Design a protein with these regions (language model features):
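C-terminal capping alpha-helices of c-type cytochrome domains
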Residues: 158, 616, 657, 677-717
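Sequence/structural segment immediately N-terminal to covalent heme-attachment motifs in c-type
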Residues: 614-635, 657-665, 720-722
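Extracytoplasmic beta-rich repeat domains
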Residues: 83-95, 125-149, 174-194, 233-271, ...
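Gly/Gly-Pro-rich "capping" loops immediately C-terminal to redox-active cysteine motifs
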Residues: 633-668, 675
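Repeat-blade elements of multi-bladed beta-propeller folds
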Residues: 51-55, 91-111, 137-163, 188-211, ...
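Electrostatic cytochrome c docking/interface patches
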Residues: 38, 599-623, 718-722
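Blade-level signature of beta-propeller repeat domains, shared across WD40, Kelch, NHL, RCC1
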Residues: 557-602
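Blade/loop signatures of beta-propeller domains
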Residues: 29-79, 238-248, 395-400, 478-480, ...
């Protein structure tokens, strides 16, 4: 070898060694996202300050061993930094992931941000350029995303238009991009859940079950290449065609009618949990579609695998076992809520279990090895649809007096569930689950057309729920008993005894998830815009932070970098508050302030003088609630529930004149308002406008009659926020 060249190589090697040795950030910046299976498994003991996966680690207990912020120091907590990564036209539902001092977080349109976890300074962002027209597929409002996965140097995100993307954790550059949609006879869908990554694979499901012709499945992709490793379907397809795998032949025996023409639902839109001890992936399966089983599966049975927890082998994709929480789902009672893995003493021995509080109101403790049901006790008194779970059969006993097919009525829980996706926190030492739930009733009835003709037609675009809508629904409600009162609670629940160590009422019916810590604290962002910190011993509030937005349907987590513990949550805006999409991070002695935005008053502008007929308004009522309400809200929805798309009652004359260009022509598609040219005709659009104008006139009349009370409430709100 040339001597000079050898000396040069040697000199450069020493120089590189010097740089790496005395500049720790050098290695970190070139090795971001270094998350492996072994690291995640060991993280509870070796790095409790990290938050490496959606649920903190593979067990997804979301319980932190950090103690710097505790019952003695909580009064020193303050806002450390903020970062606006979205706006009020999206929902911020993601859980930040923190790896080696970098926070990875997503906004509603699936944009990934890598931030310095101590300052909020942006390192990079990746925009997947989601097709904004995908908003038409959403069941539940504007664009939202529950977070990313970080694994082996990559960041993975499921996009709102149905793709799975891998991004280089160092640079933010795209590595691969795959479309998760199977086009054969199935409609497109959204992805809103966070992917999970483990055992060399990335796992993702999908949502949009209510949009018609949707059939749930989970796909495992090779983490390096994006190639499909296996796919597990959750609802059987056409029995006249070959089944994709043996489990579908089993499932098809439990369905009736021509379910495959509807799709069936069963999407895995949220919870996927990897268990390295049993080499399994637990899938939380969603509701049936349409909702009423009399429409979806007449003469059927359990309709597997709707509303179930399914365990599959991560190597083969074949099923180990399943447990169905709501056989023959009839109420939109998904089992897609978060699951936690734990260990409990049961029958004198330690059992490895999966724990879940799904929508239906019962809390389930299931053996992870074989799917044996160990406990199924109610976590709420607000259960009408069933009396109890029979432990001999493992099945809920449906209440014979609560049959909405023959008698439309209010039923608890509502389709939103007693507990929805908002994260829980499991203290494995104490055997307590901390979570928020609410008792809310919804009015259930069959679709008017189905009642009259026995036929139900799936909408190609818009929601296909199968229940009564519009004027028909309102007429039934007027004839029914009054709606039961709603109430929300947060508590510490013992799933073995079925009792609460403590439980407290909440001011808002809609709130965020929780995280508990070994410091004796429970952090809970509430729908009122308050981050409440409670004593885990008794649930008493020790500290509150009042934000200018709302924490409805969001999450919270905690992490440590260096010698400082942090708490992070996501703030949403709404129609009344022109602010949203903001990460809020707190630490001891944090001293920054978040600016208070101006409250936007909902004043009805000058209205068109069109004269619409009763029939046209009624048609518009049905069309509006089928095509518009999931984003713009049902008429009368209050601002505090964070429906953030514009209130159409407040359209000015110019917008009325441009409505055809907007809705049919797609002139605002880039702003998130898709075109409906293939769904809504010009005459139907005019009927929708007729309904909106009629509702705007009613609102304007109400405002004029109650002006003094409205001004007083606005002044009080301003004082509370000052």
């Amino acid at each position: 070898m040339n001597c000079y060249r050898f000396k040069t190589i040697l000199t450069n090697a020493f120089l590189l060694f010097f740089i790496i040795s005395f500049n720790p950030s050098f290695g970190a910046e070139n090795n971001r996202g270094n998350v492996t299976d072994e690291r995640v498994i060991n993280s509870p003991a070796e790095e409790p300050g990290s938050w490496l996966t959606y649920g903190q680690n593979f067990k997804e207990q979301r319980f932190s061993e950090l103690t710097q912020i505790n019952t003695d120091t909580i009064d020193q907590l303050g806002l450390a930094w903020t970062k606006q990564i979205g706006d009020y036209n999206m929902r911020m539902q993601g859980t930040p992931i923190v790896v080696d001092g970098v926070m990875y977080v997503t906004n509603g349109w699936s944009v990934i941000y890598a931030l310095d976890a101590t300052t909020g300074e942006e390192i990079w962002n990746y925009d997947p350029e989601v097709d904004k027209s995908s908003i038409r597929l959403a069941c539940c409002g504007p664009a939202h995303n529950r977070g990313a996965a970080v694994y082996e140097g990559k960041v993975f995100v499921g996009t709102f238009d149905g793709r799975l993307i891998a991004v280089d954790a160092n640079t933010g550059q795209e590595v691969w991009d795959v479309d998760t949609w199977i086009p054969e006879g199935l409609g497109r869908f959204n992805i809103t859940g966070a992917p999970r990554a483990a055992a060399g694979k990335v796992y993702i499901g999908q949502g949009s079950g209510e949009s018609g012709h949707r059939r749930g499945y989970v796909t495992a992709y090779d983490a390096n290449t994006g190639e499909v490793d296996w796919r597990f379907f959750l609802v059987p397809g056409d029995p006249n065609q070959p089944f994709e795998h043996p489990e579908m032949e089993l499932a098809a025996q439990t369905w009736g009618g021509e379910w495959w023409k509807y799709g069936g639902g069963g999407t895995a839109w949220n919870s996927l949990v990897y268990d390295e001890e049993f080499n399994s992936l637990y899938i939380g399966v969603g509701n049936g579609a349409p909702w009423p089983r009399e429409i979806r599966s007449p003469g059927g049975g359990d309709d597997l695998f709707l509303s179930a927890i399914v365990s599959v082998d991560v190597d083969t994709g074949r099923m180990n076992w399943y447990y169905q929480t709501t056989p023959g789902d009839n109420w939109d009672y998904s089992s897609a809520m978060d699951m936690a893995l734990g260990e409990i003493e049961f029958g004198g021995e330690q059992r490895k279990v999966v724990l879940q509080a799904p929508k239906n109101g019962f809390f389930y403790v299931i053996d992870r090895e074989d799917g044996e049901l160990l406990r199924a006790l109610p976590y709420t008194e607000g259960i009408d649809w069933a009396t109890h779970v029979d432990m001999e059969t493992g099945r809920p006993v449906e209440n014979p007096d609560v049959v909405y097919e023959s008698e439309p009525q209010w039923i608890m829980p509502a389709n939103s569930g007693a507990h929805n996706w908002e994260p829980q926190s499991w203290d494995n030492e104490l055997g307590l689950m901390y979570f928020y739930y609410h008792d809310i009733a919804n009015f259930y009835s069959l679709d008017e057309g189905f009642v009259e003709t026995g036929e139900y037609e799936i909408r190609e675009r818009g929601l296909s729920l199968g229940w009564g809508e519009g004027e028909y629904r309102r007429r039934l409600i007027e004839e029914a008993d009054p709606r039961p009162e709603s109430q929300a609670y947060v508590g510490a629940f013992d799933p073995i005894t079925g009792g609460y160590k403590w439980r407290h009422e909440l001011e808002s019916d809609y709130n965020g998830g929780v995280v508990a810590t070994r410091g004796g604290l429970l952090f809970h962002p509430e729908g009122t815009g308050e981050l409440s910190v409670r004593d885990t011993e008794n649930g008493e509030v020790l500290w509150r932070y009042k934000a200018p937005g709302t924490f409805r349907s969001t999450s919270v987590m905690t992490y440590q970098v260096g010698n400082s513990q942090y708490v992070a949550t996501m703030m949403n805006g709404n129609r009344a508050i022109d602010l949203g999409g903001t990460v809020l991070v707190f630490k001891l002695n944090g001293d920054i302030e978040l600016p208070i935005p101006e409250i936007v008053q909902a004043e009805v502008p000058e209205l068109p003088d069109d004269d619409f007929g009763v029939a046209q308004i009624s048609e518009g009522d049905d069309l509006y609630h089928a095509q518009c309400a999931s984003c713009h809200g049902g008429i009368g929805i209050p601002n505090e529930v964070a429906i953030v798309a514009p209130d159409l009652r407040l359209m000015n004359l110019n917008t009325h004149s441009e409505m055809a260009d907007i809705v049919i022509g797609g002139s605002r598609a880039e702003r998130g308002m898709p075109e409906f040219e293939d769904t809504i005709t010009p005459s139907q659009l005019e009927s929708i406008r007729a309904f909106v104008v009629e509702q705007a006139r009613r609102l304007k009349e109400f405002q004029e009659q109650n002006q003094e009370a409205i001004e007083s409430a606005a002044n009080e709100e301003a004082l509370n926020r000052a």
